[in-house]
Curated annotation (Swiss-Prot):
Transmembrane segments: none annotated. It comes from the Eukaryota. InterPro entries: DUF38/FTH_CAE_spp, Mos1_HTH. Residues 1-22 are annotated as: Disordered. The gene is fbxa-155. It holds the Pfam family HTH_48. Belongs to the FTH family. This is F-box A protein 155.
Amino acid sequence: MSDRGSDQSSSSSDSAQHIPPKAQTILTDQRSLRTCILLQHLQGKDPMEGYNLLCKSLGPKFMEYSHFNYWFMGLADETLTLDSADRFNASQVKQCIDLPDNHPAMASKTVLQTNRFSTVGDAHRSQSNIREGRNVKGIFLSFENSELAFDDDISFDNEQDDDGCIVEVEYKDDKKKTISKKKWSLKFAMKDLSAHLNGKKLVLDDFVVIMGGWRIAQDQEKWFEALQSILHSNGTVSAKCVSFVSFMTSYQTAQFLKHFESGFLERISIDADDASVEKIVCLEQYKQATSLSLGSGMFSEFFKHIDHFKSLKFCFFGKRLSKNHIELFRDNVIAKSVNLESCTFEHLDFSEKSFLTAFNAPKSATGSFVYKANKRSFTITSEGFAYHIKKNSSNLSTIKNSFPSDFF
């Protein structure tokens, strides 16, 4: 392990001028330098914070950030020791963008991709997961406590008994599924999340954020800034399904969606506390997704932007829907969309008779009937406060009454 100047002889003399004599002694001893890196972890620093501190003491170009992160995370989860061989890919080091001259989010796209899912603050669990060769398949964040405090630099300080942030990580292999669930203060919850995301090309099935508790609404900006900071510093996340639930504005939802890989993202679940859709529907992540789930109060705004989805789900939780809205959905989505295969209205305070009438159902229809539009047919079924619409096969004589499976 050496300073960056040794890789570029033309600039080695300039780099050396900025390194204190004592620092040069450390940089020439691999074990001493690794000890300094390990010390940052033992003091509770996150990778970027530890890197910046060592830049101040050892010089701004003592090591590429991605190379530092390789050793920081390896020493933290005990997959590396002070005497381990340095197997960091040298070509990756050369490809990385220098820090701190450039924003860390840019460098995260080129850091070494590994299979190590290290967790600052829970190294033993991480080490077990690594050895067993599991893959992270889902990350679920639940914010339940509103007693949060931040300084101007968003250091994720906590006050009182702030232990209401839950980080749940799902691991899958061919034989079984394991869920690791930890309840942290916000500070350590964000460190835990960062450790799972940082420097790894994860392919997630689910990334879910749930805001629970009525008091959490007053701290929207605080947890939003915390999570936004982590996602921003770790670059693009690959996930098949993204779900943002409760006490979230459409602006915050749009900002979060930007961090997920468009084209790879298939399913989106949104439950915002406002009905503004402009920031969301213009995103490629939204345009390329195939399934959408919406919370109450958003249907009337979104129905003009949903004709490209294959699966739709609307959860109204007792909120009334006018007959006019049903007819607009019938004429603008059911009749026109060539992609729609299934749709579910859940917890809808709308009588079965009115729903059937809106779709011109025969008077004799009770519970289930077939609706035809533009040479296509749909089976519409009512079940209590739920209504299911499923596209039938092209052979109308073989229509079967069936329920669309929920995609969430």
